[in-house]
């Protein structure tokens, strides 16, 4: 995805054997093609509401990032939240993914006025750690690309998306880019690299 620049040359043959050339540079925007499995999984072809999959181990978790020690484990090997193991206020967020065009998806996050910010990432959001008033209103147009991680198709869809600004999915983990590890019609598992290089994992389910 991105822009590509091309030079187009038109040659005109005139009377008497005269030839004239005209060249012009044009810029073409190439959009990333969102795979149908991702589009359908996130939006159902129209719109879907997602919530934290709080009954599943590791619905919030952390492990080593790509530049740490022995490398990534690609699962929350350092910490994984147990079923309903976080505070109740962390489980009331609703994420609405909507198909806004043949190749575009938007996100609206209703955090009920508060978001849990991981303490190490307070500077990223300009807020202290723990529960904070955080404005997530507005519709965010998501930008999809191929994943930049070293994951394989065995453990990831190899697709990631970015939420504009300091956008997030429920917990504030110091990143606005999320790799979709797994998606079904009812479950979603994502991974992101926090501001300090840790790999964070989150799991959601359809409401």
Residue ranges and their predicted role:
Residues 13-18:
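Short, solvent-exposed loop/turn segments at the edges of extracellular beta-sandwich modules
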Residues 187-197:
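Short, exposed beta-strand-loop hairpins at the edges of beta-sheets
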């Amino acid at each position: 995805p991105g822009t590509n620049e091309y030079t187009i040359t038109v040659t005109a043959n005139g009377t008497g054997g005269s030839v004239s050339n005209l060249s012009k540079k044009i810029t073409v925007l190439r959009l990333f093609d969102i795979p149908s499995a991702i589009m359908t999984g996130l939006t159902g072809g129209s719109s879907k509401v997602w919530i934290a999959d709080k009954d599943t181990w590791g619905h919030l978790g952390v492990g080593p990032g790509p530049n740490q020690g022995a490398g990534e484990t690609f699962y929350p090997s350092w910490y994984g939240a147990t079923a309903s193991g976080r505070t109740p206020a962390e489980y009331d967020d609703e994420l609405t993914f909507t198909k806004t065009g043949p190749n575009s998806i938007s996100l609206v996050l209703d955090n009920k006025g508060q978001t849990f910010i991981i303490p190490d990432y307070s500077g990223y959001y300009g807020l202290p750690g723990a529960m904070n008033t955080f404005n997530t209103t507005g519709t965010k147009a998501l930008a999809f690309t191929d994943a930049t991680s070293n994951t394989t198709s065995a453990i990831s869809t190899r697709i990631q998306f970015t939420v504009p600004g300091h956008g997030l999915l429920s917990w504030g983990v110091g990143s606005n880019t999320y790799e979709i590890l797994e998606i079904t019609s009812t479950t979603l598992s994502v991974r992101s690299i926090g501001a300090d290089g840790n790999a964070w994992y989150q799991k959601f389910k359809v409401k």
